[in-house]
Amino acid sequence: MFFRFANRVGMPTDVAHMLLELLSGVVVGFTLGLIGGGGSILAVPLMVYVVGVPNAHVAIGTSAVSVAANALAGLGYHARARTVKWRCAGIFASCGILGALVGASAGKAVDGQKLLLCFAILMIGVGFLMLRGRHDQGCADAQCTRDNAPRVMAFGGLTGILSGFFGIGGGFLIVPGLIASTHMPILNAVGTSLVAVAAFGLSTAISYMLSGYVDWGMAALFIVGGTLGSYAGMRVSRRMAGASGALTIFFAGVIFCVATYMIWRSLRG
C-alpha cells in the first residue's frame, strides 16, 4: 500500500508537492463540475507530469479514488439544481459498473508506458466526439424509455470497460453517450453523468486498491481540492449553459493539447 501523506509531512519539498496535489485536485473538481467529465482524463496526466508520480498504475488507481469522491460532491450540487435524470443514471451506471471491473483487470496487466500512450490516443478520440456534438441543444423532456433503454445499456457497458481500463471516470464518454442515446440537453447530461462517473470510479478504485495501487495521502489532497473545484465548476456551468458549444470547443482543445504532450512523452521514452 502507498501512504506517502504520512511520510513526507514536515519536509519543504513535500509541502510543495502537497500544494501541487491540492491545486491539481481543484482543476479536476472544477472540470467535473463544469462539464461532467474531464476530471479523470486530466487527473492522470496531472499526477504523472505535474505532481511527478513515477508509477502509472498508482496514478490511475489514485485518480479513480479522487475522481469518484469529487464526482459525488459535484452530484450533490447538481441534484439540488434538479439537473439529474435519475432513471437514466441508474441504467447507465449499473451496466457500466460491470464493464469497469472487467476493464480494470485488463488495464493492470498492461505496461504503464503503453497504458499512458493508449490513454492519450483515447483522449484524442474523445475530443473529436465532443466537437461533433457541440451544437446539439437536446430535448429538455428526454427520458429513458423502453425504446432507448438498450442503447443506454450498450453505451453504459462500453464506457465502463474503457473507464476501468484507463482508470478514468469516463465523463467525457458518458456525456456524449447520454446525449446520443436519449437526446437530453448537455446540462442534464452533465448532472446525470456524475452518477456513472462516481460508480465507475469506485469500481476501478476498489480493483486498484486491492492491488496496492492507491496513494491515500495524494487522494485526500485531490479530494479536498476537488470538492472546492466542483462547487465552483457547477456554478459556472449553470451560468454558461447557453454557451455550451464554446465551452465544449475550449475543453476539446485542452484535451488535444494534453494528449499531444502525453504522446510525445511516451514516444520519447
Can you describe what each PLM-predicted range is?
Residues 1-31, 44-56, 76-162, 180, ...:
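Juxtamembrane transmembrane-helix boundary motif
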Residues 35-44, 167-177:
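Transmembrane helix boundary and interhelical junction motifs in multipass membrane proteins
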Residues 56-60, 186, 190, 194:
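Small-residue hotspots at the loop-to-helix junctions and early N-terminal turns
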Residues 62-76:
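Transmembrane alpha-helices of multi-pass small-molecule transport proteins
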Residues 63-67, 193-197, 218-223:
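Short hydrophobic/aromatic, small-residue-rich stretches within specific transmembrane helices
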Residues 174-175, 195, 199:
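A general structural signal for well-ordered alpha-helical packing
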Residues 189-196, 246-252:
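Helix-helix packing/entry segments at the starts of transmembrane helices
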Residues 204-209:
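Membrane-helix boundary/interface segments in integral membrane proteins
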